[in-house]
Design a protein with these regions (language model features):
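N-proximal helix/coil linker or "cap" segments that precede and/or mark the start of modular domains
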Residues: 20-54
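A short beta-strand-turn-helix
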Residues: 44-73
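Bacterial N-terminal signal peptides
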Residues: 11-20
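Hydrophobic beta-strand anchors of alpha/beta hydrolase catalytic cores
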Residues: 74-75, 110
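Conserved redox-active cysteine motifs that mediate thiol-disulfide chemistry
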Residues: 69, 77-94
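Bacterial N-terminal signal peptides that target proteins for export
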Residues: 2-12
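Thiol/disulfide oxidoreductase modules built on the thioredoxin-like
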Residues: 125-131, 139-183
Length: 187
C-alpha cells in the first residue's frame, strides 16, 4: 500500500500532465516561430477593403496565408496601440511602395495582423497612421496565440508553403537592407 504523501505527489504529477496536455495551448510552446519552421494553418478574416482583398487575391470572408498568390509574404504582427508599430508604419509604407513600383510587384506581398484588434480598431488605426498594405483583425488573439504570442511588431518572411524564411523582432530600421534580404529570398 502506498503512503499518503507518495499518493499526493503522484496525483499532483498526473494533474500537471493533464493540465499541460489539455490546456488548449497550440503553436510554439517553446517560443516564437524561427527560420525553417512551418507556420500553422491560420484562418484569418479578410480585410474589409475591396482594394486590399484584390491585392491579396482573395474573395471569401476568410482566408489562409497560402491563399495569397506570391513568392514571398511579409507577414507583420502589430498591435493597434503599439508605439513601436506606429514608428515602423512609415518605414513599411516606404518598403511597400518600393516593392509595388519595382520588379518585385506581385512576387512579394505584405500583410499585417492586428493582434487583439477588431475592424473598428483597425479603422481607428488607419485614421491615425495610414498603412499602404492590408491589415486583418485578430480580435480574440487566436492567430497571435498560434504564433507564440509575440511582442509587436514581429515580422516574418514566409514562402507560399508557410515555411518561415526570416523573422525580426521589433522595428526594422534599415529598409534598404531588409529589401535586399527579401529580394535575395524571392526565387
Amino acid at each position: 500500500m502506498m503512503k499518503p504523501a507518495r499518493q499526493i505527489v503522484i496525483l499532483i504529477a498526473i494533474i500537471a500532465l493533464f493540465t499541460a496536455a489539455f490546456s488548449g495551448k497550440t503553436g510554439w510552446c517553446g517560443g516564437l516561430p524561427q527560420k525553417g519552421d512551418t507556420l500553422p494553418s491560420l484562418e484569418l478574416e479578410a480585410p474589409s477593403s475591396d482594394k486590399d482583398r484584390a491585392y491579396l487575391g482573395i474573395t471569401g470572408q476568410t482566408f489562409r496565408l497560402g491563399d495569397i498568390r506570391c513568392r514571398l509574404l511579409l507577414f507583420e504582427v502589430i498591435g493597434i496601440y503599439c508605439p513601436q508599430c506606429y514608428r515602423q508604419a512609415p518605414l513599411f509604407n516606404t518598403l511597400f511602395s518600393r516593392i509595388e513600383k519595382g520588379k518585385l510587384q506581385g512576387r512579394i506581398k505584405m500583410l499585417a495582423l492586428a493582434a487583439g484588434g477588431n475592424v473598428a480598431e483597425i479603422q481607428y488605426l488607419l485614421a491615425q497612421r495610414p498603412y499602404s498594405f492590408p491589415i486583418v483583425p485578430d480580435p480574440a488573439f487566436e492567430a497571435h496565440k498560434l504564433l507564440g504570442e509575440p511582442r509587436t511588431p514581429f515580422t516574418l518572411l514566409v514562402d507560399p508553403q508557410g515555411k518561415v524564411l526570416h523573422t525580426h523582432k521589433g522595428v526594422v530600421e534599415d529598409i534598404d537592407a531588409f529589401l535586399k534580404l527579401m529580394t535575395d529570398l524571392v526565387p
